[in-house]
Structure formats: C-alpha cells, structure tokens
Regions:
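Short glycine- and acidic-rich boundary segments immediately preceding or forming the N-terminal edge
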Residues: 1-26
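Active-site/substrate-binding loop(s) of hydrolase catalytic cores
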Residues: 36-189, 193
Length: 206
C-alpha cells in the first residue's frame, strides 16, 4: 500500500530503501530540499498509527509539486513507516513484539538501529516524531478530545529546559499560532515525563 501511495503521489524519485524490518519489509526514506537546516521526520513507529504517514505523503506531494521555497531552505529526510511489520499486522509492536519507542537505549531491533544510524549520519537540527492519539486524551482541562497534541520532550527527570528544548517549544508555539488563530481548536500538550528509552527523549538528551 505504501509503495502505491508513494508512486501515486509522485514521490518515487525522491525515495530509496533505508533498510529492512524484522520480516524483511523495506523501510523507505525520502529526501527533499537542499537547504542548510536539516529536519528528520518519522512516522509509524507504532504500526497501528497510520494517520501521519498519509499526512506526510500528502504534504510532500504538494510541496514538491508546487516547488515550495521551503525546500530551498531545508534538507529533509522522511521515514514514512518505521514499523512496516506492525503496519501489516495492525499492531503497535514490531514483529518481535517490541515497542520501538522504548528501544532507544537497547537498540535491539533492526528498525531502531536504522533510525539511530540515519540520525547519526544526517545530524538533523530538528527531529519530528509523528504518532496517532486516541480520542480518550483531552485538551487541557476540557472535556473535548485533543485533535492534535504537541510535545517538546524532556532530556532529564527534572524536565529542565536547555537551548535545544527551548527551540522545540518555540517552534511548537509558532505552529500553534499558525493553525489555531482563533484559539477554538482542541489542541493538547502531551505528557513530558522523561523516559530515556523513548526516542524523542533520547535524541533530546544528545
């Protein structure tokens, strides 16, 4: 299905195989732009969370079609589906029953190793880890489910704020102002309790 979506949205020429999953499914990465500022995005660490995968394909299809100036300022790597085996079985976990977003330290899985390797080689200025979220999560103290939630991950148990985390918070603030000018959307802030085994927290600590 992913291959077809990439072809249908004219992203094939930007896309290559980063590596393979436990069950030998290809993990695809697309490269866009030529700017100095580097951004790494990945989706579907949890195989049953496919919304953002489709959103990424739609976004970059439009950006490339319109030859957006954004691509002149940024160099972007996109992993659409880090956990293709979980996607195939509609499971949060990979084929070995491991939650990839708890494998940042152990790096016991081929999918985790591929993400770490790309991070180390590409050396991004920003990382964006995309997930789905169930409607049981509310936006703040309201009874409304969060339509979207943001997180600037912690890098220590004290939830300290360093320059890197401050930049992430500022970027989230700017996005919030752009997408919610009337302040009438249900936008949440995800729990920032520190867990070094999660990739966001691990990358933030580097």
């Amino acid at each position: 299905v992913l291959d077809n979506l990439i072809v249908q949205n004219n992203l094939y020429d930007y896309t290559s195989t980063l590596g393979y999953s436990v069950e030998n499914r290809p993990i695809l990465v697309s490269s866009f732009g030529s700017g100095k500022r580097k951004v790494l995005l990945w989706s579907q660490m949890h195989g049953n969370e496919s919304t953002t995968t489709r959103a990424l394909i739609k976004l970059f299809s439009e950006l490339t079609l319109k030859k957006s100036s954004l691509l002149d300022n940024l160099s972007i790597k996109v992993i659409y589906q880090l956990n293709p085996d979980g996607s195939n079985s509609y499971s949060r976990l990979n084929a070995n029953g491991v939650d990839l977003n708890r494998d940042a330290i152990r790096r016991s899985q081929p999918e985790s190793k591929l993400l770490i390797s790309l991070f180390n080689v590409f050396k991004p200025h920003f990382c964006i880890n995309l997930h789905d979220q169930r409607s049981i999560y509310a936006a703040g103290n309201t009874n409304l489910p969060a339509l979207i939630s943001f997180l600037a991950p912690s890098f220590d148990k004290s939830k300290s704020i360093n320059e890197v985390r401050k930049n992430a918070m500022a970027m989230i603030g700017n996005i919030y102002k752009k997408i919610n000018p009337e302040k009438n959307w249900s936008i949440g802030r995800y729990n920032d309790d520190f867990n070094i085994n999660c990739f966001g927290d691990f990358f933030m600590s580097q």
